[in-house]
Amino acid sequence: MRKNKFTARFLPILLLFACASGSASAQSYVQDSKRDSARSDKLTGGRIEKTALIAGGNDLKITVNVPAFQMTLWQNGKEVKTYPIGVGLKDYPIFIGSRRASEVIWNPSWIPPKSDWVAESKKVKAGEIILPTDPRNPLGKLKIPLGDGYLIHQAKGVGDLGGLVSHGCVRVLQTDLYDLAEKIVAARELDVTPKQIIAAKKTKKTLSAELNPRIPVEITYDTLVVEAGKLHIYPDVYDRKQNTIENLRAELLSNGVSESKLKDNTLKKMLGLAAAKKQFTVSVRNIEAGRALIGGQTVSVVSRAPQRRTTSAKRKRRTSR
């Protein structure tokens, strides 16, 4: 039996603003920067169990860790899928704390908010209704409202991933956003058919499904995470003074890692390797063996999405067979 009512309709007037932004300072948006990432060993016991989505299994949760540029869908406390994301600019950072997803909306309209960045724009005006058919609409094919104007919506492209790119929203690649939405539809058994979803993808007609009850969304700002026995040092993208020697020692100690033999200079170098779009990772075992630097590596915060082969590349491959 279906648990939620569904309506397919045009909603140009009822749809809310994209990204809470205004002219408030960045500091006012950070509510709880001390909360641990949901992927931390302190919360998972050192192991994250994965699962395929269970249709009709209503226990859903979404978590975001901003410095890791990661969004994870959980069901019954198990990881269903993790998606790379882009987040808010320094001047318009994403809200840190608890939100709730209220709807899934395909082909949303956009109402520019009353904010400095809209006032400076020559293309749009605050309060103007910009339909899904309008090329000025930045939301793409789908959005998931989180309350107070904060959204999860479509990214412009791969270049958004791992970047500070929005006015307070979470940006996700279209294919990933479709995947997330369809998993939510299946788990909640929403009254929307595959045929309706396909039609929404192919057209600009607005389609919406209410989430009742709403899905909890937890957004954290955790730059120092021990996950599955490996330390991840993520860049302090909002310059919150999180990546300090004192904080790193405290993180290691709280995970049962002996840090007394680590010199401040070593910790400083480790922290310095996490910058721009790079993270530094090293196993706890290597840290305890005195290989905190030489046993670690600097890698991209977000792995690049696989590139599509060009037509010429496909021809070359066929002729080489």
Specify the residue positions occupied by each region the protein language model found.
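N-terminal pre-domains immediately preceding structured catalytic cores
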Residues: 2-5, 15, 22-321
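Sec-dependent N-terminal signal peptides
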Residues: 10-17
